[in-house]
């Protein structure tokens, strides 16, 4: 035993070169499992020098996991185990901090692992040291490695703490000799191409490593028993690329023809002339992004809210095997009219609109007629909204509309003129004709309704009715007393003078007009005003123009729908029904409709909602695709289309100039351009800037606005765009006349001049299957051109008039055949040729007509 100890001591002393003293505890192999006692003390030997690197104990197959683990000395004949006690190094190595040793102990069977034993560097501290050393200690016979603490003979590795004899690896903490796991090699070398130590004993993967490998999704090395698979960095890149390829194939796989709900694209869809991208995607059961992508490939940069035409939608749908049926959005918004039985018509009360200049007494007149005060409800003398009232007289009912007289409410007055039957024009006898008076006249004339003039305030000393009659006669309102057709009534609303006569004149005018309606049909009317009431919700004043409205009826009001929950008369009393010419307040609307919007009762609430939805879509899209002459206004550019449709018999113009004289000169020049086909009518002319009331008058009468040395402000321009009214600006009078003249010349039917260029006689008929009959002809005069029109004449009677389909000379197609040559002629749409008939070729020249 002493010889063995001597051999070990000499070996250790030969390796000492730093002069450091370490304390080694030398044990025999047979004593490693024996417990220490006072009877058998340990034998200790102090070495004069030791390796710089503290030696890590190896686990022994036969120990219990708590006793020190020994390693045989290189030159000893028998195995001995040694252990180095933890001591501080000299000042030259004081900056080095040792790493925690995490060697795992594994049972010989390999079925499970022992708990990690305490590191000898911890002393009695329970905290595990996790920081790496700032300076790597020198190791005897080290294997190649990077940032790893390994024992003698250890293989290369990267950031892994392994026991002696372990193969190289990559970021793995494994027991001695372990070879499995990503990058673990048998006795291999790590980065740096350093030689590794001998391979350790094959060890199974611990349960912790298996869980870590599964969590990372790594395939690791080969899991076959006894087989090691080497994996290089190239292999890892290939693996990562394969995973990415698989991911992108799943993420961006080819789009199937299925929608967001899993429903396949329908074989046919119905769209409007213009459709939103999002709505098209919804109809085709596709994601909006797919539709947008297809449109971008077609060169269209769109978003989900952009609108495309039906042709583009059809091209896109065709790629998915879907057919598109185009329907008119405008037609979807129209409610079919009921057919009335003539026996159901009855006389209805007249609807009267009171117009006039502010403070001329129109509200006082209505108050006197109704015998109830409404003046207290006004603010600043201006009526806040259009009121509708019905009054009883000795001869019948009369419905009154009170339109505001101030310029700010001109648009509402225009709507009032559209629903009225008779206009009462109130003019103060002591004031005369004012600008608002002329505006009221223009609106009434545009609505083509009769005007009854009420000269008010005749009780005042300064009243001059004759002056008023003269001024109005200059504007086309000549009284019956002076040989005209306008009825005048002199009244005093404050003194109740002439009121009964005025009512009598109104009813007399209504009898002349023979106003009738059918109370047995569904109600149809117009929204006079609408508001949001905090207690009742949306409330609309409706003037029923035909039919009868009852509580519970579903309806459509503008773009909104609803069901009548309750109805009130003009006195605020609940009513069950409202007949023709009756104003009623209606609740139960799902929105606040605009004044002037149409009101229609429906048989079914579902149908009402559908029409409401179509009108909302139409409002979003605008007038695109709507029928010409129904929604868009007349412009100088589209007048020709209107005249072709027969929708324009008269071109209406509003003239505004800087001075009155210029306006009159332009008016006289334009009125001379009228023709029997199209009449030019200047409905209003005056001096001053173009204002909102001019735009609303143009909208109500479908007219153009001509500005001479005047402009419209931005607010008025925005209103004109909303109402689709065209405003044209000029600085020279003849420019106005010339442009209007050119526009009207475009309305004139062009003159067509026909010129016969050749005739041919049919001498033989050739019947060709699948083609038809071909006439063998001899050109007798002029020439026959393939592009010419032809007519077939038999016995002086024209049998057919059309176009040539083919022209042949022998077997060749030719463009023309001159006199004296034979040819074969096929006429498009005609086969009933007879020998002896004449084919006449002619051209038509279109000459544009001009105004004289």
Curated annotation (Swiss-Prot):
Top-rank lineage group of the source organism: Bacteria
Residues given in the record as GTP binding sites: 356-363, 402-406, 456-459
Compositionally biased spans, kind Gly residues: 150-200
Primary subcellular site in the record, as a coarse category: cytoplasm
Region (G1): 356-363
InterPro entries recorded: EF-G-like_DII, EFTu-like_2, IF2_II, IF2_N, P-loop_NTPase, Small_GTP-bd, T_Tr_GTP-bd_dom, TF_IF2_bacterial-like
Keyword annotations from UniProtKB, A to Z: Cytoplasm, GTP-binding, Initiation factor, Nucleotide-binding, Protein biosynthesis
Pfam families: EF-G_D2, GTP_EFTU, GTP_EFTU_D2, IF-2, IF2_N
Biased composition (Polar residues): 106-120
The keyword Nucleotide-binding is annotated on this UniProt entry: yes
Segments of this protein annotated with the region G5: 492-494
A molecular function (GO) term: translation initiation factor activity
Location(s), subcellular: Cytoplasm
Annotated segments matching region G3: 402-405
Chain intervals for the UniProt region annotation (Disordered): 1-240
One GO location term (cellular component): cytosol
Biased composition (Basic and acidic residues): 78-90, 227-240
Region annotation G2: where it falls in the sequence: 381-385
Residue span of region G4: 456-459
Residues annotated as domain tr-type G: 347-516
NCBIfam families named in the record: IF-2, small_GTP
Family: Belongs to the TRAFAC class translation factor GTPase superfamily. Classic translation factor GTPase family. IF-2 subfamily.
HAMAP family for this protein: IF_2_B
Entry function: One of the essential components for the initiation of protein synthesis. Protects formylmethionyl-tRNA from spontaneous hydrolysis and promotes its binding to the 30S ribosomal subunits. Also involved in the hydrolysis of GTP during the formation of the 70S ribosomal complex.
Name this protein carries in UniProt: Translation initiation factor IF-2
Gene label: infB
């Amino acid at each position: 035993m002493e010889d063995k100890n001597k051999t070990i001591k000499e070996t250790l002393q030969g390796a000492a070169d730093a002069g450091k003293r370490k304390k080694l505890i030398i044990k025999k192999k047979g004593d490693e499992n024996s417990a220490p006692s006072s009877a058998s003390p340990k034998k200790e030997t102090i070495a004069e020098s030791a390796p710089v690197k503290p030696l890590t104990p190896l686990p022994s197959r036969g120990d219990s996991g708590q006793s020190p683990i020994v390693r045989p000395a290189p030159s000893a004949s028998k195995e001995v185990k040694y252990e180095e006690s933890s001591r501080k190094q000299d000042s030259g190595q004081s900056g080095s901090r040792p790493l925690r040793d995490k060697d795992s102990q594994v049972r010989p069977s390999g079925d499970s692992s022992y708990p990690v034993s305490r590191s000898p560097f911890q002393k009695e501290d329970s905290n595990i040291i996790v920081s790496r050393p700032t300076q790597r200690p020198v190791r005897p016979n080290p294997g190649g490695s990077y940032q790893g603490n390994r024992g003698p003979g250890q293989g290369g590795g990267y950031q892994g703490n392994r026991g002696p004899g372990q193969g190289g690896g990559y970021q793995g903490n494994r027991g001695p000799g372990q070879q499995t796991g990503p990058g673990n090699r048998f006795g291999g070398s790590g980065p740096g191409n350093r030689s590794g130590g001998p391979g350790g004993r094959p060890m199974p993967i611990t349960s912790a490593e298996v869980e870590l490998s599964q969590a990372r999704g790594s395939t690791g090395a080969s899991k076959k028993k006894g087989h090691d698979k080497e994996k290089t960095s190239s292999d890892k890149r290939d693996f990562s690329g394969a995973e990415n390829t698989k991911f992108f194939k799943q993420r961006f796989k080819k789009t199937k023809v299925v929608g967001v709900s899993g429903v396949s694209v329908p074989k046919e869809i119905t769209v409007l002339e213009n459709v939103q991208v999002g709505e098209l995607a919804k109809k085709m059961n596709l994601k909006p992004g797919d539709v947008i992508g297809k449109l971008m490939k077609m060169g269209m940069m769109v978003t989900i809210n952009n609108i495309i035409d039906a042709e583009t939608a059809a091209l896109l749908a065709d790629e998915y095997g879907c057919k598109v049926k185009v329907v008119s959005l405008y037609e979807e918004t129209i409610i079919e009219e009921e057919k009335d039985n003539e026996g159901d018509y009855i006389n209805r009360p007249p609807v009267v609109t009171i117009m006039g200049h502010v403070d001329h007494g129109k509200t006082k007149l209505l108050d006197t007629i109704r015998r109830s005060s409404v003046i207290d409800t006004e603010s600043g003398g201006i009526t806040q909204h259009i009121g509708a009232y019905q009054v009883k007289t000795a001869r019948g009912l009369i419905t009154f509309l009170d339109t505001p007289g101030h310029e700010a409410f001109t648009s509402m007055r225009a709507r009032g003129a559209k629903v009225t039957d008779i206009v009462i024009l109130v003019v103060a006898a002591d004031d005369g004709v004012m600008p608002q008076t002329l505006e009221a006249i223009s609106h009434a004339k545009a609505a083509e309704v009769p005007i009854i003039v009420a000269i008010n305030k005749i009780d005042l000393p300064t009243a001059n009715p004759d002056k008023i009659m003269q001024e109005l006669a200059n504007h086309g309102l000549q009284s019956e007393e002076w040989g005209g057709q306008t009825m005048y009534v002199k009244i005093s609303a404050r003194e109740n003078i002439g009121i009964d006569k005025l009512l009598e004149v109104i009813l007399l005018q209504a009898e002349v007009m023979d106003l009738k309606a059918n109370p047995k049909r569904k109600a149809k009317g117009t929204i006079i005003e609408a508001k949001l009431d905090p207690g009742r919700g949306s409330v609309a004043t409706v003037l029923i123009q035909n039919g009868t409205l009852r509580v519970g009826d579903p309806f459509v009001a503008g773009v909104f729908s609803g069901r009548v929950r309750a109805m009130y008369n003009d006195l605020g009393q609940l009513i069950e029904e409202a007949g023709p010419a009756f104003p009623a307040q209606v609740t139960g609307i799902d929105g606040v409709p605009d004044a002037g919007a149409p009101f229609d009762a429906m048989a079914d609430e579902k149908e009402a909602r559908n029409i409401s939805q179509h009108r909302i879509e139409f409002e979003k899209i605008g007038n695109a695709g709507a029928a010409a002459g129904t929604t868009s206004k007349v412009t100088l550019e589209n007048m020709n289309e209107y005249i072709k449709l027969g929708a324009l018999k008269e071109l209406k113009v509003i003239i505004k100039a800087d001075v009155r004289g210029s306006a009159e000169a332009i008016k006289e020049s334009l009125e001379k351009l009228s023709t029997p086909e199209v009449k030019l009518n200047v409905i209003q002319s005056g001096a001053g800037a173009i204002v909102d009331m001019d735009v609303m008058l143009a909208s109500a009468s479908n007219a153009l606005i001509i500005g001479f040395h005047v402009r419209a402000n931005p607010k008025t321009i925005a209103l004109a765009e909303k109402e689709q009214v065209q405003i044209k600006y000029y600085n020279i009078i003849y420019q106005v006349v010339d442009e209007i003249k050119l526009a009207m010349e475009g309305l004139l039917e062009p003159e067509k001049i026909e010129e016969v260029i050749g005739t041919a006689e049919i001498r033989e008929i050739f019947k060709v299957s699948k083609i038809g009959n071909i006439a063998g002809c001899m050109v007798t005069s002029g020439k026959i051109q393939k592009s010419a029109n032809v007519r077939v004449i038999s016995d002086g009677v024209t049998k057919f008039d059309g176009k040539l389909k083919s022209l042949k000379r022998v077997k060749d197609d030719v463009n023309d055949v001159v006199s004296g040559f034979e040819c074969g002629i096929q006429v498009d749409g005609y086969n009933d040729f007879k020998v002896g008939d004449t084919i006449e070729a002619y051209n038509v020249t279109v000459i544009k007509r001009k105004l004289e």
